[in-house]
Amino acid sequence: GDADMALDLNPSETIVDLARDTNGISIDNLSSCCCTHASGLSVLASPSSPELAEYIQSNHTKAIIDVARNYYEYIILDCGCALTDPVITALESSDDIFMVNDVNILSLKRAKLCQNVLSQINQQDKVKLIINKNVKKNNVKISDFENLLGIDAYAVISSDLKTVNSSLNSGQPLITYKPRAVIAKDISSFANKLIMEREGTLTATTKKKSFGKKK
């Protein structure tokens, strides 16, 4: 993913540097390779060029997750669409798999194909359906995804290309760039729902400031 660019961060090291570190993967090495956003979020940047991704193997993915689990409350992995061996390892190590889909016929087809693959590796029960770029008037409905996949939508994110582009170009997260926008509220609701499921007794306001921070 491009989280570092979206957050206006300039990483000096990436996940490739961590994977190639001869001292192995430790919390010290992981921390030194991460960038820290003003919100407290730690970001491990993706490879600086596509060809470098070949240095990331399944054992690196597992080691990074295993180390990070002991130090971070929440770990978010932006795995993309290709189900490579390192990605499958990440999915197998995850508590939840958020399947993000735009509301169109191609996404509907891909969602079913993805679900079939996840079923083959016994990961289908982790899937939570996220509907992205939702608009009220559309030939493809949220219910089409729900009926085809046999699961309810976990979260629905409204379409607002103008606000998203402005947020990206400014290097600010949506929820701080334009917190009153419907799309920002949708994302906050999604995050708070996840937090409340994990830690039920805590309020959204209490946890919002520490989402993604170290323990």
Model-derived features: where do they sit?
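Phosphate-binding/switch loop-helix module in NTP-utilizing enzymes
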Residues: 46-87
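NTP-binding/hydrolysis catalytic cores, primarily Walker-type P-loop NTPases
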Residues: 169-215
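Phosphate-binding loop that captures ATP/GTP phosphates
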Residues: 1-43
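Conserved C-terminal guanine-recognition region of P-loop GTPase G domains, centered on the G4
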Residues: 110-123
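Beta-strand-loop-alpha "switch" segments that mediate conformational coupling across diverse proteins
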Residues: 133, 146-173, 187
